Amino acid sequence: MDLPGPIHDFLLVFLGSGLILGGLGVVLLTNPIYSAFSLGLVLVCISLFYIPSNSHFVAAAQLLIYVGAINVLIIFAVMFMNGSEYYNDFHLWTVGDGVTSLLCTSIFVSLITTIPDTSWYGVIWTTRSNQIIEQDLISNGQQIGIHLSTDFFLPFELISIILLVALIGAIAMARQ
């Protein structure tokens, strides 16, 4: 999508602030329903990030799969659980919460100070062969596969890591 510079920048700032507010809502809200709705906001903002980079199919797939299926499943699971068990033993801060908060804050501060100082122009994420340029001989499914394995490799891997962490968290919660 070819947007003028100020509109593109405003869109990125708007979606980024939606991501930050939704992420804070997921972590800080004590009601699990509100937290699940905040997760839905985060997933919608992530899917909308793909639209300015002209990957409408990935945005639609992200929206359908994560918001339409996963988040609705999480909301149904939270609604079927007993809500009183969340509030019985509610302590404001424990030692583990403090250590986790300190660790996450230090990682966040180190990333905020490191990322702007890094020269990203020398980093080559992927290499494309000359065969990919000839797109007339390639079907749409193959083009999606090529784009997922070259142009969108990093977001695809980050999504797979997020799914792995969610799966491990679900297994840990089910064992308790």
From Swiss-Prot:
Keywords for the protein's UniProt record, in alphabetical order: Chloroplast, Membrane, NAD, NADP, Plastid, Plastoquinone, Quinone, Thylakoid, Translocase, Transmembrane, Transmembrane helix, Transport
KW Transport (keyword) present: yes
Annotated GO MF terms: NADH dehydrogenase (ubiquinone) activity; quinone binding
Location relative to the cell: Plastid, Chloroplast thylakoid membrane
InterPro entries per UniProt: NAD(P)H-Q_Oxidoreduct_6 (IPR050290), NADH_UbQ/plastoQ_OxRdtase_su6 (IPR001457), Nuo/plastoQ_OxRdtase_6_NuoJ (IPR042106)
Record-level GO cellular component terms: chloroplast thylakoid membrane
Gene3D superfamilies xref list: NADH-ubiquinone/plastoquinone oxidoreductase chain 6, subunit NuoJ
Catalytic activity annotation: a plastoquinone + NADH + (n+1) H(+)(in) = a plastoquinol + NAD(+) + n H(+)(out); a plastoquinone + NADPH + (n+1) H(+)(in) = a plastoquinol + NADP(+) + n H(+)(out)
Enzyme Commission no: 7.1.1.-
Cysteine disulfide links: none
Membrane topology: Multi-pass membrane protein
Residues spanning the membrane: 10-30, 32-52, 61-81, 92-112, 152-172
Family to which this protein belongs: Belongs to the complex I subunit 6 family.
Role: NDH shuttles electrons from NAD(P)H:plastoquinone, via FMN and iron-sulfur (Fe-S) centers, to quinones in the photosynthetic chain and possibly in a chloroplast respiratory chain. The immediate electron acceptor for the enzyme in this species is believed to be plastoquinone. Couples the redox reaction to proton translocation, and thus conserves the redox energy in a proton gradient.
Subunit: NDH is composed of at least 16 different subunits, 5 of which are encoded in the nucleus.
Name of this chain's protein: NAD(P)H-quinone oxidoreductase subunit 6, chloroplastic
High-level lineage: Eukaryota, Viridiplantae, Streptophyta, Embryophyta, Tracheophyta
